[in-house]
Amino acid sequence: MNPLRVKLDALISKTSLTVTEQQREQLVGYVQLLDKWNKAYNLTSVRDPMEMLVKHILDSLVVSPHLVGERFIDVGSGPGLPGIPLAIMHPDKEFVLIDSLGKRIRFLKQVIHDLKINNVLPVQSRVEEFDPESGFDGVLSRAFASMTDMVNWCQHLPKPNAGVFLALKGVRPDDEITLLPEWCSVTDIKALQVPELEGERHLVILSRKG
């Protein structure tokens, strides 16, 4: 068996996630494509595919149980994190992956084609200039910006009254929380357990007040 698949299976076994055979193969395929493209396009500072499984794949997958709704947007998606792993985990949900760099969008289109992922739309745009036809249940960000910048730049993206912001962070970002704009409030903070990852991970869930 592919060593990446062996490692992925071992990591998943340390979580409570349910991941099908097809999803596991797609996740491994994604890492292989990321590794291949990374050599030419410098999409991530993580060079070792085994390390990518922990720092990129599992770090994204642990958000999976906290997705409520049908439509999500991953802002500043980069090479598709956390959007691609989450889209693989949730084929019944729609994901828009937005990034301003053309090389990243080209990579995402290749991933979608090669892995036959049909619930992802890659968009090349600055997030503050993106004008969707309708709002999203969740606005995801990972290593994108401060939470204040994120909610200010993305405040037009969540569904009115129902949509939330989902910010994936390291240590609990209490300093950032104190700087949030008046209209925004923290509704929950989830401590995330990522197998074999050093350091803390937290998911901060935010929404518009009222």
Swiss-Prot record:
Transmembrane segments: none annotated. The keyword Methyltransferase applies. Gene3D superfamilies: Vaccinia Virus protein VP39. It catalyses: guanosine(527) in 16S rRNA + S-adenosyl-L-methionine = N(7)-methylguanosine(527) in 16S rRNA + S-adenosyl-L-homocysteine. The keyword Methyltransferase applies. It comes from the Bacteria. It is found in: Cytoplasm. GO terms for molecular function: rRNA (guanine-N7-)-methyltransferase activity. Pfam families: GidB (PF02527). InterPro entries: rRNA_ssu_MeTfrase_G, SAM-dependent_MTases_sf. S-adenosyl-L-methionine binds at G76, L81, V127, E128, R142. One of its GO terms (cellular component) is cytosol. Its EC number is 2.1.1.170. Keywords: Cytoplasm, Methyltransferase, rRNA processing, S-adenosyl-L-methionine, Transferase. CDD domains: AdoMet_MTases (cd02440). HAMAP family: 16SrRNA_methyltr_G (MF_00074). Belongs to the methyltransferase superfamily. RNA methyltransferase RsmG family. Specifically methylates the N7 position of guanine in position 527 of 16S rRNA. This is Ribosomal RNA small subunit methyltransferase G. The gene is rsmG.
